[in-house]
Amino acid sequence: GKIGVAIGTSGPGGTNLITGIAGALYDCIPTLYIVGQVRSTELKGKLTILQRGFQEIDIVKLVKPITKYATQITNCNNIRYEMEKAVHYATQGRPGPVLIDLPMDVQEANIDLSNLKRFHAKSISFPESADLFNRSISMIRRSIHPLIIAGGGIRHAGAVKEFREFVDKTKIPVVFSFAGLDTLPHNHPSHIGILGQYGHAGANQLSQKADLIISLGSRFTKKMVGSNPDRFASKAKVISVNIDSGELKDGQKQLDLAVQADVKYFLAQLKDLQYETGEEWNLEATKAKMKWKKLKGVRRLVNPYEFIDHLSECMSDKSIIIPDVGQNVVTTVQSIRLKENQRIFSSWANSPMGYSLPASMGAKLGNPDKEVICIIGDGGIQVNLQELQTISSNSIGVKIFLLNNNGYVTIQEFQDKKLGGRYVASDLKHGYSHPNFKKLCSAFNIPYHLINTQKDFYKINETLKTNGPILCEVSIEDNFRPILPDPMPDTEA
């Protein structure tokens, strides 16, 4: 499969990569990180001193817990072997990050590629699964109220086409994790909504009525199933398909059938399944989808749900949408209506503020002919504000929608719930501030629009049609809170 590559210098260059490495691990992104290091002769090794070479740091030891493989190369003749080994680990099985630490003298060495040792990978094998596939087929045939949870593992397995064919054939209703949201277009009759605390009430309620849960490439996280997983879908048998045996063995939900396989292979074994969901259950699922109610209506400033509605209408058919974290990601995934070939992704599991700005740059550079939309908050954009200069100087045509609610709403919600509304560093009255974004755009030579009320929504189209980069600030009321669906039992933080 494809692999991303990031290169950093020694010391702080390596440590600055750590948040990205963690995100790549938790979202299963195959990535090779190459980090510089002081010369081998300057490494402190087993010496008891703090540091020997300037900016020396044991980056391998730091990232071991959040990589699939990390090593330091001190012999230049091992470069090919270690590179091939790292790429293999990054791309095989459950994808993830790997890191290679290269001392300066190894970087400078002259090598003969033809004489270097090669890495010969062993083929990955999974437990014999014929019986598991047969049992899966039997459980599906016996079910009356089946429900699929679509996770990120569908796309990781390259199984979007097979997944859609399976859903079209069986007509089983589908609910989604954030990472699986773009595996089925919003207008598909089996598309119900997002499962969990930050999803849709109808999707949650339907899961409680299901008699069979088929989880495809998803994890049963607390945000999805609540603090008491036994009460999630308590009437249902559960089939979980995951390439990672650890998720099957030690996941939070008790499984009736654990299938270690990638989703594409699993669906291939079910291609001869003759099954179609009954009309009564499909009608129930359709009613569940219709239960999603946005906070509609004109407000003093902008209702973010209405904004995302309008943005959905204006986006091109092959747009890539990258929301950041906090309120803007919740309102985006809850309200966006994805079309057939649109993509949405973020750092779903690690969720660092500021992610969507540099991620949008990478998405645009990798897909120059596609419309790339960054949705970010006034707090998040300040984490990576310097990237506006990179965007400007390289004319990277990202369309940035900055949802400005004058604070950290997710933190405010926690302070409301746990601290009696005693805000600290989370709003304009208690230590938080942000710059004048119009002046900031002028300084970076980036065009600027302002959507101050819903009457300004025509500027969404103007923003999307602008050649090159542009930032559109959207004024959100300070006290606006995203809609959280009826929670699963025991979902207290």
PLM regions and their residue ranges:
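N-terminal alpha/beta PP-like core and its mobile active-site loop of ThDP/TPP-dependent enzymes
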Residues: 1-274, 314-317, 397-400
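Active-site nucleophile and cofactor-binding loops and adjacent substrate-binding regions
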Residues: 6-13, 74-75, 324-325, 343-357, ...
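A short, conserved beta-to-alpha structural element at the edge of catalytic cores
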Residues: 38, 350, 395-419
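Glycine/aspartate-rich loop-and-adjacent alpha/beta segment that forms the canonical ThDP
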Residues: 106-129, 224, 229, 454-493
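Long, charged amphipathic helices and adjacent flexible linkers at domain junctions
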Residues: 114-133, 278-302
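Active-site diphosphate/adenylate-binding microenvironment
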Residues: 286-369
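Catalytic phosphate/nucleotide-handling subdomain of diverse soluble enzymes
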Residues: 355, 359-399, 403
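Acidic, Ser/Thr-rich peripheral helices and adjacent loops at domain boundaries
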Residues: 414-433
